[in-house]
Structures are given as C-alpha cells and as structure tokens.
Curated annotation (Swiss-Prot):
The chain crosses the membrane at residues 49-65. The gene is CYSTM9. It comes from the Eukaryota. This is Protein CYSTEINE-RICH TRANSMEMBRANE MODULE 9. InterPro entries: CYSTM_dom, WIH1-like. It is a single-pass membrane protein. Its main location: membrane. One of its GO terms (cellular component) is plasma membrane.
C-alpha cells in the first residue's frame, strides 16, 4: 500500500466551552468555604492538654523499641 493512499483520520479537539471535569458535592455536614445564610456561628473549640501521661507513654514506647532492637 502506498503511504499516500492511506486513509487519514482527523481528530477534533474537545470544545473549550466546558467548565472542567465534574466534581461531586461534599458530603452533608462537611464544612465549606462559603458560609450559608442562617448558619449559626462556629463555636470556639476547646483543646485539652494531653498531660504528663502522654509523654511518659511515648518515652516508654521508644525505650521498648530500643530494647527490642538490642535484643533481636
């Protein structure tokens, strides 16, 4: 077959009028950037201190890993 006799397919580019890929809406109750009219103001969130027990547990875990590493 002669290369000049081959059928050439033309490919059209998609139109640029689309606004991009479809994205699904966020789940119900998921916070969004836009505040809805009538939404109550966000309450202040109070954080709790993890206390001394948290750090003791972390140190114990690190020591346990070091001992296991030395033994095995």
């Amino acid at each position: 077959m002669n290369p000049s006799e081959q059928n050439h397919l033309s490919v059209e580019k998609p139109s640029q009028t689309s606004s991009g890929p479809y994205t699904s809406p966020p789940p119900i109750g998921y916070p969004t950037r836009d505040a809805m009219v009538g939404d109550p103001p966000a309450a202040a969130v109070e954080t709790k201190s993890k206390g001394d027990g948290f750090w003791k547990g972390c140190c114990a875990a690190i020591c346990c890993c070091c001992v296991l590493d030395a033994c095995f």
